Regions:
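AAA+ P-loop NTPase catalytic core and its hallmark functional loops
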Residues: 1-197
């Protein structure tokens, strides 16, 4: 069933962006269902919307790329067994969509760690040696990010990172059809929202 009130042409543009390997940035006012839309797109394309990064002032690069199991790291040194993959690592390894919520709330230096993954489609793991030190993204990997227009200026994205994304504005629904409450069940058995075009 249809979940989001949005122009079909906008959805088509989003799908074209993702199909061509470009990152997708959904921007708009709070409450315009950007997160739900990114979840639906990720599920439709990858069959999985669980690879999600929640942006914030305390978000670190380890939470985005990878971390370490320190017990294994101390006992055996850096290895693929000791590496703990974060959403970005998992998405590149498995060829899936990664969702980055509220990216403009994330510190600039953390945002810019996405540059190599979006342009060269490769993540370097300097702690490892040989082939394990380079993770190349499988086909299907991409990033859908969201940003609130109210957060503009909090952590403004660099020009280099902006060039890696296609921006799509998600607009609020301008108005709902007027309806007398006592007639709601008769006029719209599915509720007032059932009368609105959705996709």
């Amino acid at each position: 069933s249809r979940k989001v009130v949005i122009s079909p042409s906008a959805v088509e543009r989003m799908l074209v962006t993702l199909a061509t390997g470009r990152g997708l940035m959904l921007v708009g006012e709070p409450g315009t269902a950007k997160s739900l839309l990114s979840e639906l797109l990720a599920t439709a394309i990858s069959g999985d919307a669980g690879l999600t990064i929640q942006g914030g002032a305390s978000t670190t690069e380890d939470q985005i790329k990878y971390g370490w199991n320190y017990a294994l790291l101390i006992n055996h040194g850096p290895s693929t067994e000791a590496l703990v993959p974060a959403p970005l690592y998992q998405g590149m390894r498995d060829g899936k969509i990664v969702r980055f919520e509220e990216i403009t709330r994330t510190p600039l230096e953390v945002q810019d760690c996405l540059l190599g993954m979006l342009s060269d489609r490769v993540m370097t793991v300097p702690e490892l040696t040989g082939e394990a030190s380079q993770l190349y993204a499988r086909e299907g990997f991409n990033i859908i990010a969201t940003a609130n227009t109210r957060d503009r200026g909090v952590n403004e994205m660099s020009a280099a990172l902006k060039r890696r994304f296609d921006f799509e504005t998600v607009f609020p629904v301008p108005h709902f059809l007027p309806c007398d409450n006592k007639n709601t069940a008769v006029l719209f058995p599915g509720g007032p929202r059932s009368a609105l075009p959705a996709c």
